[in-house]
Amino acid sequence: MDNLSEALEKLKLASTDSATDSVESCLDCLLKALVNNNTEASVKIQEMGILPLLPTLLNPQSSCTPKVANIIAEMAKNEFMRSPCVEAGLIPPLIQLLNSTDQEVLLQTGRALGNICYDSHSLQAQLINMGVIPTLVKLLGVHSHNTALTEMCLIAFGNLAELESSKEQFASTNIAEELVRLFQKQSEHEKKEMIFEVLAPLAENDVIKLQLVEAGLVECLLEVVGQTVDGEREEDIAQLKTASDLMVLLLLGDESMQKLFEGGKGSVFQRVLSWIPSHNHQLQLAGALAIANFARNDGNCIHMVDTGIVQKLLELLDRHVEEGNVTVQHAALSALRNLAIPVVNKSKMLSAGVADVVLKFLQSEMPPVQFKLLGTLRMLIDTQAEAADQLGTNGKLVERLVEWCEAKDHAGVMGESNRLLSALIRHSKSKEVVKTVIQGGGVKHLVTMATSEHMIMQNEALVALGLIAALDLVAAEKDFVGAHLVSVLHKLLSDERSAPEIKYNSMILICAVMGSEPLHKEVQSLAFIDVVSKLRAHENKTVSHQASLTEQRLTAQS
């Protein structure tokens, strides 16, 4: 360490004149000390006040520059040295050096900046604001044959791409082309992984998704899938997962998805379809997720159902009923749910037996699968009276729905169960379905649903309760009383925040339950007439008209 102190003193003197040779030998001594004991040497360099001298030594014309940048990179491996490096004003001269043509200068400068800003979002954001992204992308293009420089750029991109503020800057460069070109040249697993690590965060941006698709990334990914699908090695399995996951990510953008769909004629779309019958779980998963993404608009959904995709998904689900893979089940159900959204698809999918296959998963204890199963059935029966009737009289299904209506730990499952229960009644308008729901204990849940914070759910509940009251009031009477239906309706009508349709359907329901003696008594005891008469002046004509009718009914039966 004595040599180091001596070298540091010399460096202080030498840096004031421009005796390059003596500076070089001092720098060599510093580097040697850092290699031997980085922490101790770094402390010494800081204590001797050397950091403020370094900006002047970072001169693009000087032969010392790569060594100075290397020293900074070594010191900044220590967390405690990063702030002092920033305070000494090292970042601006280092950024200037990124315009150098000297590959060694570029490499050491990149290392220095990377180490100083390691793990600091605020410093990385500063680099982005100072315009390093376009500079680094240009470097990658010019020096793509230099492995060390390429790796330095990739590590920098990987760190910067995590920041949201970087995406816009990346999108304005030709990063997509550069990365795809680089990817095509790689044969080593590690190098491909490095590029994947940059691609994944970048591909979260919709503009960059499209650029990557246009640059030919999808073809590269399909090639990786082809090479690794039958591989047993760990790296093959990892690459297959990364490539297929990235493929699905690209489909999350509307423009990139439509470009790859190509009206259902696209070769990429066809390849993805072939993944569904594969024996590889990862590919089955990616294939089903890709279909779910392609099924984000009605045109695509209609085309896919017409070309027989439903059968492939049902066969896939059938393979996963026993000892099934939960992620595959979830993905295939997501795809079916999306495909069932257009009205013209519903009857075709019902005829293909979708409901029967979906019901095989009723026993699943996995909330994500339960959630998608419920959503798929709800989409299928929308406007389909016959199917709603068939499912609504299925005692096992209704029993399970009632059970899930109490799944307090899983709000999504609870909400979807309530909505499906209501939908079975609303779309079937069947006395048999109402009877099944009453016997299964579903009425109290529909009353609770009417108090939901989501207006759409409140409304669905009120319409279903109205149908129960109209179709079988006698059988429902006890449950209505037990669930305090009348006081719930009183609250909804008194609450100024209730939407017009909530007020309207609550009044319809009040009229419907008047035929029951105990419910009628409750209506009288709660002075409904006051609340209803106020609603005659409501700005919504439908509400004010219904208020008049309800008031007449209440007066006549009081």
Regions found by a protein language model. Name each.
Residues 17-31, 60-76, 87, 100-118, ...:
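Alpha-helical solenoid repeats of the armadillo/HEAT superfamily
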Residues 38-39, 79, 121, 164, ...:
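Leucine-rich repeat
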Residues 43, 83, 122-125, 168, ...:
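Recurring C-terminal helix/loop segment of individual leucine-rich repeat
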